[in-house]
């Protein structure tokens, strides 16, 4: 069996490689996908990809496995970054990492290797199970690290080639394995934030592409102007960090795109702006449309929290979702990801928040 392993330079993908080797497979080649935008934005921050590559080289040397670098910066910009910029300009809250997996790691990369390999291995925290020649995406053992949210838009064809060796492990167990076998990157910290930015701050990326435009910050309850901001595209509904005003905490509860106004509220009044009903479209089902929508739960952001909900099919590509509890940060552009027990069924894009 010929196996391709996607190495990032981090601990997770390195332990995934080790576990495949430990199973006795020998026909293995590693790939590092270069998608960072920091060549373009090098004046903003330091470039991590050389550091990543140093760790990739060290890990491959330890296990005597060949590796290759593939540059996907152009594809990434066209398929993921341009979408992110467009969503921000439209006042939405994008989820670029979902498309990173669908369109680049398991899209452009699969096209590049063109059926050369029987299996592609990564360090994602998720599980793929097979039944009756169909593939099912399941949550990882580690519910905190679980990445099924970001893998929710995979196709059956993509899943047929994938294996996630870390799906049955806790992060603490992965760290311990790295120490036990003395991996070169055993003490490296986990990466944070959006995958294509590296060490670039998100707001610097936004500023580079969309610029700045002064606008007012208004307290929702009083209508009083209590500050200014540099553009609505820097803010998302539910945001608390980065408002930088005294007498907090403050939360972003509404955006007026036409007037470039950010509305904020104190925590004690914030619940009045919470919503529970919204519409989603651009629906993707991993195993086709379910026969019923009973006992569904959804996530509206990466993390452990799931909501019980009711789903109502309005049209072929339109679903109304009603949560059992209100949420403070539902925003157009986010993705609602569907679950039944531990199975991830797919997801859809939020485009209208109702009540």
From Swiss-Prot:
Catalytic function, reaction form: S-sulfanyl-L-cysteinyl-[protein] + uridine(34) in tRNA + AH2 + ATP = 2-thiouridine(34) in tRNA + L-cysteinyl-[protein] + A + AMP + diphosphate + H(+)
E.C. numbers: 2.8.1.13
GO molecular function: ATP binding; tRNA binding; tRNA-uridine 2-sulfurtransferase activity
Stretches for region Interaction with tRNA: 145-147
Keyword rRNA processing: no
Enzyme class name: transferase
Localization in the cell: Cytoplasm
Gene3D superfamilies recorded: Adenine nucleotide alpha hydrolases-like domains, HUPs, Translation factors
Signal peptide range in chain numbering: none
Source superkingdom: Bacteria
Keywords annotated in UniProt: ATP-binding, Cytoplasm, Disulfide bond, Nucleotide-binding, RNA-binding, Transferase, tRNA processing, tRNA-binding
GO biological process assignments: tRNA modification
PANTHER family reported for this sequence: PTHR43052, TRNA-5-TAURINOMETHYLURIDINE 2-SULFURTRANSFERASE
Family statement drawn from the similarity comment of this UniProt entry: Belongs to the MnmA/TRMU family.
Protein function: Catalyzes the 2-thiolation of uridine at the wobble position (U34) of tRNA, leading to the formation of s(2)U34.
Protein name, UniProt field: tRNA-specific 2-thiouridylase MnmA
Species classification: Bacteria, Pseudomonadati, Spirochaetota, Spirochaetia, Spirochaetales
Gene: mnmA
């Amino acid at each position: 069996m010929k196996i391709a392993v996607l190495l990032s330079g981090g601990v997770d993908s390195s332990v995934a490689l080790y576990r495949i080797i430990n199973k006795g497979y020998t026909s293995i080649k590693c790939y590092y996908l270069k998608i960072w935008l920091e060549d373009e934005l090098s004046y903003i921050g330091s470039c991590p990809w050389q550091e990543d590559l140093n760790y990739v080289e060290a890990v491959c040397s330890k296990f005597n496995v060949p590796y290759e670098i593939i540059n996907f910066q152009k594809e990434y910009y066209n398929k993921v970054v341009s979408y992110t910029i467009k969503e921000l300009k439209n006042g939405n809250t994008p989820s670029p990492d979902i498309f990173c997996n669908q369109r680049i790691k398991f899209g452009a990369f699969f096209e590049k290797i063109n059926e050369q390999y029987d299996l592609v291995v990564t360090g994602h925290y998720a599980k793929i199970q097979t039944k009756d020649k169909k593939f099912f995406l399941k949550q990882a053992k580690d519910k905190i690290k679980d990445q099924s949210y970001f893998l929710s838009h995979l196709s059956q064809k993509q899943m047929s080639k994938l294996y996630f060796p870390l799906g049955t492990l806790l992060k603490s167990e992965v760290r311990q394995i790295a120490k036990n076998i003395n991996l070169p990157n055993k003490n490296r910290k986990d990466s944070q934030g959006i995958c294509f930015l590296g060490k670039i701050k998100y707001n610097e990326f936004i500023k580079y592409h969309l610029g700045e435009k002064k606008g007012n910050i208004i307290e929702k309850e009083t209508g009083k102007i209590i500050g200014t901001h540099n553009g609505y595209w820097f803010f998302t509904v539910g945001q608390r960090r980065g408002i930088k005003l005294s007498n907090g905490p403050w939360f972003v509860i509404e955006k007026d795109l036409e007037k470039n106004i950010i509305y904020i509220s104190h925590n004690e009044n914030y619940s009045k702006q919470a919503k529970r009903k919204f519409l989603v479209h651009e629906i993707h089902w991993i195993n086709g449309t379910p026969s019923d929508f009973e006992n569904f739960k959804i996530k509206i952001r990466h993390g452990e929290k799931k909501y019980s909900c009711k789903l109502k099919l309005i049209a072929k590509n339109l679903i109304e979702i009603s949560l059992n509890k209100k949420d403070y940060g539902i925003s157009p552009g986010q993705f609602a990801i569907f679950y039944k027990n531990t199975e991830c069924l797919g997801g859809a894009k939020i485009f209208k928040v109702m009540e």
